[in-house]
């Protein structure tokens, strides 16, 4: 079964994220459990936790259908020790918040070397950061998102994701989220069903579908291989509709949150309905 949704706002209370997801007929959703552009957040109260769990139960969202995202400020591969510790502490807090909310996944961008340390050292720091967070939490899987490779961000090659996973001690609590826009911008073609087959055969060979715990379904304003992260609405960008139809008809993408981060929230309900309909539509080769 496909879990299809969007990254919805939690403004006014975390429970509102589940309500907003239900309003667009989503069967999955993503959210921030705190302000994504601030380091510190007030601890979750029992009331906030209870309200969130009640809303999820009311609208039939299990932890497998929810993909929380951490703060954009966190850099788990930071080259400077003091800044690395700050990021690690913030990441542990994010994991603990998920734990409190009964959530089983936490999606995050791997990190950046900032042109100060080699890629390999940065990837090792990211893996070590994950190990530290996993030791201090229970039941939450660290879900590494592929990146477009803007600036000094790592994670734009499947090999980067594999290297991080290789350095994580508890393989049962690490996974990946593939963002279609990021993959395309990083040089993984998705414009035809044949290219989709090739790209995900590469993913299976290097990382493995066993680690796929979520997807971000975004078309791309950015050009193929541009290393620029610019999302677009489905079918309106440089990827086109075929990739998303193909994903909807491939059972390797069942049972994980498939999340829209497309640029127009006003049409998320339409995009979700379209994605659902593609499960039985004819694929044009």
Swiss-Prot record:
Q: Name the Enzyme Commission number(s) assigned to this protein.
A: 3.1.21.2
What family does this belong to? Belongs to the AP endonuclease 2 family.
How does the cofactor attach, per the note? Answer: Binds 3 Zn(2+) ions.
Query: Which residues take part in binding Zn(2+) 1?
Result: 69, 109, 145
Group of enzyme by EC = hydrolase
Instruction: Give the source species.
Output: Citrobacter koseri (strain ATCC BAA-895 / CDC 4225-83 / SGSC4696)
Q: Which NCBIfam families match?
A: nfo, PRK01060.1-4
Q: Which UniProt keywords apply?
A: DNA damage, DNA repair, Endonuclease, Hydrolase, Metal-binding, Nuclease, Zinc
Report the protein's function.
Answer: Endonuclease IV plays a role in DNA repair. It cleaves phosphodiester bonds at apurinic or apyrimidinic (AP) sites, generating a 3'-hydroxyl group and a 5'-terminal sugar phosphate.
Q: Which CDD domains match?
A: AP2Ec
In terms of superkingdom, the source organism counts as Bacteria
Q: Name one GO biological process term.
A: base-excision repair
Q: Does the keyword Transmembrane helix apply?
A: no
The record's listing under SUPFAM superfamilies reads:
Xylose isomerase-like
Question: Where is Zn(2+) 2 annotated to bind?
Answer: 145, 179, 216, 261
Alphabetized InterPro entries for the sequence: AP_endonuc_2 (IPR001719), AP_endonuc_F2_Zn_BS (IPR018246), Xyl_isomerase-like_sf (IPR036237), Xyl_isomerase-like_TIM-brl (IPR013022)
Query: What reaction does this catalyse?
Result: Endonucleolytic cleavage to 5'-phosphooligonucleotide end-products
- Residues the record lists as binding Zn(2+) 3: 182, 229, 231
* Co-factor requirement: Zn(2+)
- Enumerate the PANTHER family for this protein: APURINIC-APYRIMIDINIC ENDONUCLEASE, ENDONUCLEASE IV ENDODEOXYRIBONUCLEASE IV
The molecule here is called: Probable endonuclease 4
Please give one Gene Ontology molecular function term for this protein: DNA-(apurinic or apyrimidinic site) endonuclease activity
Q: Which Pfam families has this protein been placed in?
A: AP_endonuc_2
